Amino acid sequence: MSLPASFDLTPEDAKLLLAGNVHLGSKNVQVHNKPYVYKTRPDGVNIINIGKTWEKIVLAARIIAAIPNANDVAVCSSRTFGQRAVLKFAAHTGATAIAGRFTPGNFTNYITRSFKEPRLVIVTDPRTDAQAIKESSYVNIPVIALTDMDSPSEYVDVAIPCNNKGKHSIGLIWWLLAREVLRSRGIIPDRTTEWSVMPDLYFYRDPEEIEQNAAEEAKAEETEEAPAAEAETEWTGETDDVDWADSGATPAAEDAAASNW
């Protein structure tokens, strides 16, 4: 697929894809994914052609932008590393996010409370999101998937070749897809305007790591505040010399004795 010159992969985006390890595929190759292999390293790892990855991102974004109602796009991720990414993608594009376990019958059983009728489904991994793809095939819903070299392509209409197992790779692909959708819709005015959202927002973060960082920051603040509090409350044990006669003030004991009881 050839793209117009304005849609070409920029050097900055190419560096992002390489920095996020999007180009590192699996050692096994499924027959339909062979066109996306750039070459194979001596250790057996297949290098993905990031030019093909970018072409599929642009194609997928045009498909998403062509749907009038953004809520009719369902984004799914059973894989832990992709759940934060799909939630952020849904927040920025208006899609419907299904993060975590996909409940069987979401697309086919209209009796369930979670029943949905999307016009397009996007999944993070065809293996972990196999149930969503299977139900989409029953009701003729097109599917866009992030596929590694060993991912099955059955019932997948548009495959975005990438490393769909690394947290940085998954987050970066969803970020690029969201940015391209906003460009296609005209929310980002032109292709030279930078998007204010950073790719880091789409990366998976370990809850325990977040709590640990928060605890360390709180501990650091306490250690900084402790010396200041000690300096404020330090008592020297000295009293000011006051001349009661000159000031016109009398000690409390003399006042009590002079008063009329």
UniProtKB/Swiss-Prot annotation:
SUPFAM superfamilies: Ribosomal protein S2
InterPro entries: Ribosomal_uS2, Ribosomal_uS2_CS, Ribosomal_uS2_euk, Ribosomal_uS2_euk/arc, Ribosomal_uS2_flav_dom_sf
Cleavable signal peptide: none
GO biological process, one term: translation
Keywords per UniProt: Acetylation, Cytoplasm, Ribonucleoprotein, Ribosomal protein
Domain of life, per lineage: Eukaryota
GO molecular function, one term: structural constituent of ribosome
Region (Disordered): 212-261
PTM annotation (N-acetylserine): residues: 2
Biased composition (Acidic residues): 222-244
Gene3D superfamilies membership: Glucose-6-phosphate isomerase like protein, domain 1
Chain coiled-coil ranges: none
Localization (cell): Cytoplasm
Protein task: Required for the assembly and/or stability of the 40S ribosomal subunit. Required for the processing of the 20S rRNA-precursor to mature 18S rRNA in a late step of the maturation of 40S ribosomal subunits.
UniProt family annotation: Belongs to the universal ribosomal protein uS2 family.
Binding partners and assembly: Component of the small ribosomal subunit. Mature ribosomes consist of a small (40S) and a large (60S) subunit. The 40S subunit contains about 33 different proteins and 1 molecule of RNA (18S). The 60S subunit contains about 49 different proteins and 3 molecules of RNA (25S, 5.8S and 5S). Interacts with RPS21.
Protein name: Small ribosomal subunit protein uS2
Annotated organism of origin: Candida tropicalis (Yeast)
Gene: RPS0
